[in-house]
């Protein structure tokens, strides 16, 4: 053994080829500080051996290296620029040391080689992947750029255009795609991986492969003619900005770094990367996006823990077909859990099966599935007009019409047919779980399971704990949601649960602006373009449906009359009473039609303005700051109330609910990250300016105390 540490082992194989194996404790290899220090020491030990002729990098795990240890990032990025620069220069010195070894090097890549893992393989002369490999630089998804030489080496290996696509999208690349562009030199079966890498090194030692020429190319400026370079980078900037927009600076910064470094050798090019990395690491966007990643890990960790308490869900059932039932059935079956789809009407079953078939056909058309897989998934969905096939289900999801009496009746019925230990969940967006539990003989096996529409696209599931729900029930539904590929957050029962409870105060702020003559299209523009929502409030209400919004608003007003009660009609009422239901009937705030390509089209409709003018008078202009304040303050305060009341367990889970359930702008990180970035005291001062507008604008005592102590919701 040449070197051994808890994370890395180095041994000498036949023919004087050294093997460096990444094998950290735990399930995966990460590039944390300990691993980086071990790699540095291992390379020093290797350099001291005079007989080594080549080096192969391998992994003792199912994956190569999943990337940097992101849990270290926020603390590290809070350091002074000088400290951060010192860290990044030391890290890069290790990668340079690997690249500068006086003999050929190769990486044997299996599973993920992402971020720092990808930058490790780029520092070697040859790269051989097996068929399980996924390679990529996802850093821009975290608001930063690669910091261990990725922006320098990748363009010199696969060309600037290909490298910019990899870096700016942050997507994982399949081995066959990596082979096409030259990021890897061969793709082999997993059992042949190490032997293939060693054979390539033997060929290099025997001078059949010119490893020194390959290495020199990575050390040198890019070989791009000046005019071609200018055209390439100008085109890239336009394309990247069109996708990333102004709120996500990292992809554009990556293009600039590659452009500036194009004429430089390795040393100068790395300095350009370092400076850009440090600048981005200090941004609020990086803090927000890294925060989302860490919050996602926390939520997934909780779900994994729940799996230990959970009942094993081998089969499921959904009551109520149609679009929602079909979506739930598709999601369950496509992720491997067979499901019965039960309805009282054959046309509804046909619609549900049609929805599942449509979603599967789209997967096949995009090359993400095959006709054989599609048939297998459809065979996992059993349509039924009676309860007989439901009796074997481990979990039953009730998804009938959103009406308390109908749901209560269906829940009471299904309880008679299922096994004693089957778990029953209601997919409801507004009806109290405690109320529905009254219709059940065993309320301890019952909880809420709120899917968001469309089911196949929306990642969030709210698992709602009723006062009688057992821990096993909650754990089992959380585990089932995870198995379906969803991100579950557990919330306690209250009107609107968590997501809808905080959404409707936002709509109330919007209604308030319209009642004073605000222009809904202008408000949407501000909330989309400036704040960053995927849809402004008027457009979102049209998509949700004004009938659904009208009903949910009434539920919220009844549940929280002091804050959400109304004294008269608002804009939602005006649209609903004039049968303008949104996209579903082609007219809401906007008018909807289909364009020549069959895609839905949204247009401003003069009729909406006439109706609003008749109800609220002449239009009045509001500036962007006031629009943002008056819509967001109520949502933010209500989110804080949910945390204080224990409806949601932590700021992290609340922020994930907002990002995954509502599309809260990821670059802002969620309500609590947004509050911390803004400063709680600054927010309280802003809210106090609007406190005269009513209870939705009045901060809680606990918020005021936190502001007075200069506190924050996240611990740095």
From Swiss-Prot:
InterPro entries linked to this entry: 3-OHacyl-CoA_DH_CS, 3-OHacyl-CoA_DH_NAD-bd, 3HC_DH_C, 6-PGluconate_DH-like_C_sf, ClpP/crotonase-like_dom_sf, Enoyl-CoA_hydra/iso, FA_oxidation_alpha_subunit, FadB
Binding of NAD(+), residues: 324, 343, 400-402, 407, 429, 453
This protein's pathway: Lipid metabolism; fatty acid beta-oxidation
Annotated positions for site Important for catalytic activity: 119, 139
A molecular function GO annotation: 3-hydroxybutyryl-CoA epimerase activity
Enzymatic reactions: a (3S)-3-hydroxyacyl-CoA + NAD(+) = a 3-oxoacyl-CoA + NADH + H(+); a (3S)-3-hydroxyacyl-CoA = a (2E)-enoyl-CoA + H2O; a 4-saturated-(3S)-3-hydroxyacyl-CoA = a (3E)-enoyl-CoA + H2O; (3S)-3-hydroxybutanoyl-CoA = (3R)-3-hydroxybutanoyl-CoA
Pfam families recorded: 3HCDH, 3HCDH_N, ECH_1
Biological role: Involved in the aerobic and anaerobic degradation of long-chain fatty acids via beta-oxidation cycle. Catalyzes the formation of 3-oxoacyl-CoA from enoyl-CoA via L-3-hydroxyacyl-CoA. It can also use D-3-hydroxyacyl-CoA and cis-3-enoyl-CoA as substrate.
Summary of subunit composition and partner proteins: Heterotetramer of two alpha chains (FadB) and two beta chains (FadA).
Protein name in UniProt: Fatty acid oxidation complex subunit alpha
Phylogenetic placement of the source organism: Bacteria, Pseudomonadati, Pseudomonadota, Gammaproteobacteria, Alteromonadales
């Amino acid at each position: 053994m040449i070197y051994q540490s808890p994370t890395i082992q180095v041994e000498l194989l036949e023919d004087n080829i050294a093997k460096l194996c990444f094998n950290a404790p735990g399930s995966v290899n990460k590039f944390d500080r300990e691993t980086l220090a071990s790699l540095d020491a291992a390379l020093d030990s290797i350099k001291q051996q005079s007989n080594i002729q080549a080096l192969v990098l391998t992994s003792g795990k199912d994956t190569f290296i999943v990337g940097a240890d992101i849990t270290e990032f926020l603390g590290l990025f809070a350091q002074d620029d000088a400290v951060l620069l010192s860290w990044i220069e030391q890290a890069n010195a290790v990668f340079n040391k690997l690249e500068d070894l006086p003999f050929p090097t190769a990486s044997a890549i299996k599973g993920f080689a992402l971020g720092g893992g990808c930058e490790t393989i780029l520092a070697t002369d040859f790269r051989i992947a097996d068929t399980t490999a996924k390679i990529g630089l996802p850093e821009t998804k975290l608001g930063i750029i690669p910091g261990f030489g990725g922006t320098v080496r990748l363009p010199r290996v696969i060309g600037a255009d290909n490298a910019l696509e990899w870096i700016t999208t942050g997507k994982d690349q399949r081995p066959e795609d990596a082979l096409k562009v030259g990021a890897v030199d061969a793709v082999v079966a997993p059992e042949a991986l190490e032997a293939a890498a060693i054979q390539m090194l033997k060929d290099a030692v025997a001078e059949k492969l010119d490893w020194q020429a390959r290495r020199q190319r990575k050390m040198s400026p890019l070989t791009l003619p000046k005019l071609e370079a200018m055209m390439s980078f100008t085109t890239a900037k336009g394309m990247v900005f069109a996708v990333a927009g102004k709120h996500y600076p990292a992809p554009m910064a990556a293009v600039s770094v590659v452009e500036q470094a194009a004429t430089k050798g390795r040393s100068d090019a790395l300095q350009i990367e370092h400076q850009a990395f440090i600048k981005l690491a200090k941004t609020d966007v990086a803090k927000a996006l890294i925060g989302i990643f860490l919050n996602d890990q926390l939520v997934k960790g909780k779900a994994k823990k729940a799996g230990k308490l959970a009942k094993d869900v081998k089969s499921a059932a959904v009551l109520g077909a149609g679009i929602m039932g079909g979506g739930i059935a598709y999601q369950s079956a496509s992720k491997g859990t067979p499901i019965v789809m039960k309805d009282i009407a054959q046309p509804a079953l046909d619609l549900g099966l049609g929805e599942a078939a449509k979603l599967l056909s789209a997967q096949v058309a995009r090359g993400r599935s095959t006709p054989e897989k599609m048939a297998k998934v459809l065979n996992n969905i059993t349509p039924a007009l009676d309860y007989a096939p439901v009796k074997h289900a481990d979990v039953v999801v009730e998804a009938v019409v959103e009406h308390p009496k109908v749901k209560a009746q269906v829940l009471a019925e299904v309880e008679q047919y299922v096994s004693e230990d089957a778990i029953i969940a209601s997919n409801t967006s507004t009806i109290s779980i405690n109320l529905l539990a009254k219709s059940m003989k065993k309320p301890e096996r019952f909880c809420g399971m709120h899917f968001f529409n469309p089911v196949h696209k929306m990642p969030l599931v709210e698992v709602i704990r009723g006062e009688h729900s057992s821990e096993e029930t909650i754990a089992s539904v959380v585990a089932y949601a995870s198995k379906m590929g969803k991100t579950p957050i557990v919330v306690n029962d209250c009107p609107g649960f968590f997501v809808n409870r905080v959404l409707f105060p936002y709509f109330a702020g919007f209604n308030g602006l319209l009642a004073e003559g605000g222009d809904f299209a202008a408000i949407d523009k501000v909330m989309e373009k400036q704040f960053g929502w995927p849809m402004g409030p008027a457009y979102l209400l049209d998509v949700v449906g004004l009938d659904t919004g009208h009903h949910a608003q009434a539920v919220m007003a009844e549940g929280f009359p002091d804050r959400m009660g109304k004294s008269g009609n608002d804009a939602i009422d005006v649209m609903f009473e004039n049968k303008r239901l949104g996209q579903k009937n082609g007219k809401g705030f906007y008018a909807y039609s289909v364009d020549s390509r069959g895609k839905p089209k949204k247009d401003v409709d003069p009729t909406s303005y006439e109706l609003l003018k008749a109800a609220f008078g002449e239009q009045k202009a509001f500036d962007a700051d006031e629009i943002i304040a008056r819509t967001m303050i109520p949502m933010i305060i209500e989110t804080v109330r949910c945390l204080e009341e224990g409806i949601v367990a932590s700021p992290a889970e609340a922020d994930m609910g907002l990002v995954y359930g509502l599309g809260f702008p990821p670059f802002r990180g969620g309500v609590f990250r947004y509050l911390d970035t803004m400063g709680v005291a600054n927010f309280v001062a802003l809210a106090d300016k609007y406190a005269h507008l009513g209870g939705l604008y009045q901060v809680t005592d606990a918020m005021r105390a936190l502001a007075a102590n200069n506190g924050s919701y996240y611990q740095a």
